[in-house]
């Protein structure tokens, strides 16, 4: 457990320090995470990897309904039956994004979502995140890429926080 040294963390309007196990589980279902180096199960197809969160939560029928549209949205329909090692870095990042949003979360946390991809794929991923934001999703992005931040500010970001060694250095729209 991490304990706050100062301030409070509120999670969907509730003090995170006093949430019980059920409330934490409910909050986790409302958050999707796109990891920088997303781990996939190499023996499952990309479609199976993306659907995994629904499958383990007894929502497999929902996965069967939503998966084709989601694969099309991220541009992976043709790669659905491939195994993870067969994908390029950009395809893996799009699969990670699809897996993060398959549960229809309210918040998407993306850790360096464009860190391992070329410029063109970076732009494509940013467009996908922008589309999610326009659907009412909150997008939190952790990145070292100032160019990405500048590009996102005009499309998605309402607020940018600059941190150094865990300390807030700057907050606002100007960077």
How would you label these PLM feature ranges?
Residues 44-51:
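Short coil-to-helix segment of the ABC ATPase nucleotide-binding domain corresponding to the Q-loop/switch region
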Residues 82-85, 103, 135:
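Conserved signature/switch motifs of ABC ATPase nucleotide-binding domains
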Residues 7-15:
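Conserved ABC transporter NBD signature motif
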Residues 83-87, 91-93:
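Conserved ABC ATPase signature
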């Amino acid at each position: 457990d991490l304990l706050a040294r100062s301030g409070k963390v509120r999670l969907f309007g509730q003090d995170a320090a006093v949430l019980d196990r059920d409330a934490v589980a409910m909050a986790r279902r409302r958050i999707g995470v796109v990891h920088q180096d997303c781990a996939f199960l190499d023996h499952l197809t990309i479609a199976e990897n993306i659907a995994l969160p629904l499958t383990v939560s007894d929502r497999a029928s929902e996965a069967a309904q939503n998966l084709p549209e989601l694969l099309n949205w991220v541009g992976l329909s043709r790669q659905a039956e491939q195994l993870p090692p067969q994908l390029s870095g950009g395809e893996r990042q799009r699969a990670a994004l699809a897996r993060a949003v398959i549960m229809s979360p309210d918040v998407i946390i993306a850790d360096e979502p464009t860190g391992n991809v070329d410029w063109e794929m970076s732009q494509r991923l940013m467009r996908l995140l922008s589309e999610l934001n326009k659907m009412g999703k909150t997008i939190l992005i952790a990145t070292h890429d100032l160019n990405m931040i500048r590009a996102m500010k005009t499309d998605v970001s309402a607020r940018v926080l600059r941190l150094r060694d865990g300390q807030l250095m700057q907050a606002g729209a100007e960077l």
